[in-house]
């Protein structure tokens, strides 16, 4: 019956520019999947991550591929079931690619029920139609053997349906198909394909059901096998314009294979991506990115979207987190809101009634002022204390308004006052008699002050009538210049907000002769001084004469901005405002040149953000440091200009201001690192011409540092701890770039410069020192026609995948790779392990000699396949006996470096 079954190559019909021969693939039509007909379903999916694919030299797998819901103490395995059918049946499973349509994979399944073709089969029925596969392992095929393995699989599948053999033409077709499959196949991801066959009338299992495909299974040793996870963000909301800087902590990611995706889960399907470069990914565990703008600039209320991490190549995503876009704040400083307030009419300040008097009171005599209800509102700063409530005090106590009662033109004498007040004496006696002499004395003093104030106001009004100069009125009312409205704005604030230049000049003149009042530096409820508002509203002339009368430019608003910071954010008017500040001669101006805002940006950085070479010149000519570093990441003005791709600013900084092209950030990145990482050929060329160091290394090791020893011995406590960071080479601009044009520029520049001194080998393991003969032999092995790109797989295993595209077009990719590994401080054991895992035992024999065999580190521990813990090779050997030792030595000897 076995010979009656033909698994075929389901799904391997076409891929891009190649097609399989339909005469080779002849699958039978599956039974229709209907509500009444039989069909196959997956009951338990396989676990996607944490399972390691095994090479042949490693021996059989242990534990088996677990199920998706498997836990400690309750293990599950991939399970399928035939529904709507009872009777004998056969269920088989093989490996297919992770891309659609599924195609046969070069890897094979191994286990008790698996054949040489990598197909595992079990029988089910007639009652229980469920099949559980509890002993599946994945045999990893190396790239070197991949071509031969694929040809063998295709040949055997073809011969099962036609035993007479293949012609030469068919053999060539199979080889071409295998070659094309190799180009598109990912060796780190597989899927299980379950196929069910029912018994036919002749007794053979030849009636196929529709196959079902499992979810992808990732090799735990592959760089992209770890789950993506967002651990923390410092911001969950930002402006609809985008550009907000967010710090995101995450599980391990690869800087060249990660992006931050913003999206909406609705019918519109909007998505955008965070803006960051490879240098913004810190140690693979943190990303600093800038939010993208929302697709609608005008929103009335906050909008919540989602963000997630996404791998560029595999398409894997993390769990989504929420992010809120809030509406655009056009009037952050509230200037427009205050301008929209209704202007007062002439009669409003007088409390109603006739504009010559308030309330029901008549005209006051002498200098007593207006009577009636709200007349006291004219003197809020002078009436700090009064022993009487408004309108309740004795009318004869002081000359002035109150209560709406009409008053005499002169202060009455005591006798006439007593005689006149006699008819109403009973009603006033209870109020006056309890007053102590001290209170009466204070009331008299208060009345005297009011009388003097009225006299001064009257004199000012008379002077105004003669001169028509409003300053005469303001001088008499100068004590009222400190009055504030509900927003904390003084008359000077309001005059600046409304652009009343003549009023501002008049108030400033009075302020100049009344410095003791401190009006010029009073702040409103937003911590804005008049100078802040003059800068915000772009009134350069007002800025100048405010500074002349003592305005302090060093005072900060609620955002931590001084007048200079605000001037540099003023857009087109920034140069004139900045010039007015710098030429004022204020003592605080030199201090402002070296004062950061609350975001850690100095004026030179804000000038770059403003894209203004003129402002940069003004600042540097006044004493600002062009090499000043902002406090968040240590970037200079040249770093910021490079990030913004501002060719004009970069040219200006380098040629005129002589900015240091090799200045480093806190992470050791130069402007050339940023230009290369962002893929800017023009800026890269400019920086190289200006003398940028092509060999400059940042602080992130190209190869990861080895794990500290976990031994309990006392050896690791002897002597001082060594700093291994200096023993490893960091990333150069060439390591960071993904742009072909930038790579060409950097490679050409590297050929014209001297190589940097070799980095000493790491003290953590035997250093790699390749002789010319060994290097040539390895180049022949890895670059030969039979190698089929083995050097690229070696780069990935050595943690140097970022160099694959860089060295692909060189005459000897493997030679360049090995020299980089040697310069990076790579050790011999790591290279031996990588070659052994790839099945390149000849390379192992080339490197291993009598002098190096004894220097290899002791056998390391390897992870258990099912990801429930780990057991050492020695423990596995006790259970299974000694595994077959491959020629050339151990398959495991050193922890595999992780890929950046």
Curated annotation (Swiss-Prot):
According to the UniProt record, what happens if one changes residue 404 to A?
No change in cleavage rate or products
Keyword field: Activator, ANK repeat, Biological rhythms, Chromosomal rearrangement, Cytoplasm, Disease variant, DNA-binding, Isopeptide bond, Nucleus, Phosphoprotein, Proto-oncogene, Repeat, Repressor, Transcription, Transcription regulation, Ubl conjugation
Site positions for Cleavage (when cotranslationally processed): 454-455
Which residues are in the RHD domain?
Answer: 38-343
Where does the protein principally reside? nucleus
Reported effect of changing residue 405 to P? No change in cleavage rate or products
PTM summary from the entry reads: While translation occurs, the particular unfolded structure after the GRR repeat promotes the generation of p52 making it an acceptable substrate for the proteasome. This process is known as cotranslational processing. The processed form is active and the unprocessed form acts as an inhibitor (I kappa B-like), being able to form cytosolic complexes with NF-kappa B, trapping it in the cytoplasm. Complete folding of the region downstream of the GRR repeat precludes processing.
Q: Known consequence of changing residue 406 to N?
A: No change in cleavage rate or products
Annotated motif Nuclear localization signal: location in the chain? 337-341
Q: Identify the stretches annotated as ANK repeats.
A: 487-519, 526-555, 559-591, 599-628, 633-663, 667-696, 729-758
Q: Where is this site: Breakpoint for translocation to form NFKB2-IGHA1 oncogene?
A: 490-491
In chain numbering, cross-link Glycyl lysine isopeptide (Lys-Gly) (interchain with G-Cter in ubiquitin) is at 855
Q: Which residues carry this modification: Phosphothreonine?
A: 429
Q: What is the effect of changing residue 717 to A?
A: Loss of phosphorylation
From the Swiss-Prot or TrEMBL record, state where the protein is found.
Answer: Nucleus; Cytoplasm
Q: InterPro entries of this UniProt entry?
A: Ankyrin_rpt, Ankyrin_rpt-contain_sf, DEATH-like_dom_sf, Death_dom, Ig-like_fold, Ig_E-set, IPT_dom, IPT_NFkappaB
The name this protein goes by in its record = Nuclear factor NF-kappa-B p100 subunit
